[in-house]
Amino acid sequence: MKGGKRVQTARPNRINGEIRAQEVRLTGLEGEQLGIVSLREALEKAEEAGVDLVEISPNAEPPVCRIMDYGKFLYEKSKSSKEQKKKQKVIQVKEIKFRPGTDEGDYQVKLRSLIRFLEEGDKAKITLRFRGREMAHQQIGMEVLNRVKDDLQELAVVESFPTKIEGRQMIMVLAPKKKQ
């Protein structure tokens, strides 16, 4: 639908004519304090500078207003929030499955994967699954988990270590050590 009415989105800050207070505490373009002035005087100063008068904290007594370019202010705000989102890392739990009879070659490949996960800052979940008669040899499973724990002790801390078997599997969770 072309040419329709555009819905005005609510701004987080009131600007220029939207400010309702009679007197405001005014801050200049460079952040300098200009004192408490009337709203009309503040609007005139903003117009002289060719920018907007923006209400920063409406709940203060009197409300704090700043002379600034509102478009630039919104751009800087969104840019900084995007930067913050980039810096946040979602910690994932990566799972590697072992068996009591996992051979040396397979063990080394899985160990390299675990090292990569921990270096990337992710947690690692080691699942040791027993099948058939392997259930009778649970100590072999514990030896495998202890070996993994010992091999990764410089990189990781054990978050949970199995004390008993759950169903047909044992689960150990490793978290990466904090970097100094």
From Swiss-Prot:
Disulphide linkage map: none
One GO process term, biological-process aspect: ribosome disassembly
Site residues by UniProt (Important for 30S binding): Y107, K110
Keyword annotations of the record: Cleavage on pair of basic residues, Cytoplasm, Initiation factor, Methylation, Phosphoprotein, Protein biosynthesis, RNA-binding
One Pfam family here: IF3_N
GO MF term set: ribosome binding; RNA binding; translation initiation factor activity
Modified positions (N-methylmethionine) in chain numbering: M1
Similarity field: Belongs to the IF-3 family.
PANTHER family given in the database record: TRANSLATION INITIATION FACTOR IF-3 (PTHR10938), TRANSLATION INITIATION FACTOR IF-3, MITOCHONDRIAL (PTHR10938:SF0)
Note: A short form called IF-3S/IF-3 beta is found both in vivo and in vitro and is probably produced by degradation of the long form IF-3L/IF-3 alpha. The major form is the N-methylmethionine long form. Uses the non-canonical initiation codon AUU, which limits its expression.
Protein name, as recorded: Translation initiation factor IF-3
